[in-house]
Amino acid sequence: MKPEYRRLNHVTINVPAGEHEKVRAFYGGVLGLEEIPFPESLASTYDLIWFKCLDFLIHVDFTPPFFRPAENRHPALEVKNIGEVRRHFESLGAEIREALVIPDRDRFYVLDPFGNYFEIIEMHADQVR
């Protein structure tokens, strides 16, 4: 039987151990995501903070070992008003990187304090997603 996918549930981002305040400042402050409670049943085994993003979660994992992020492995978040979003990130001191042009969208990257890339995209209205 072919799987019937309902939605993306979560992505996991790896960061160095002990950087909880930097994570909260970036993911909660810069990206504007809501932190949600981490299940107590997992707390003795894992060190994570969970953030809600639309209808999926971002699990930020402090559990060693930390792997150096790679630019080509990243989540992409679609936004409205990409220019305003970019100015907001810049006003908060977030690191911005340019992205190569793709004709049907505007995009750039924002990096968390540990080098994890997030692609920020605004699709042109007449394009299929």
Go through the PLM ranges and name each one.
Residues 1-24, 73-75, 127-129:
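N-terminal beta-strand motif that seeds the catalytic metal site of vicinal oxygen chelate
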Residues 1-7, 90-129:
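Vicinal oxygen chelate
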Residues 13-57:
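Core segments of cupin and vicinal oxygen chelate
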Residues 41-44, 66-67, 100-103:
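A short beta-turn/loop motif at secondary-structure boundaries
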Residues 47-49, 73, 104-108:
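Short beta-strand micro-motifs in enzyme catalytic cores
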Residues 68-89:
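Mid-chain, well-packed structural core segment of small domains
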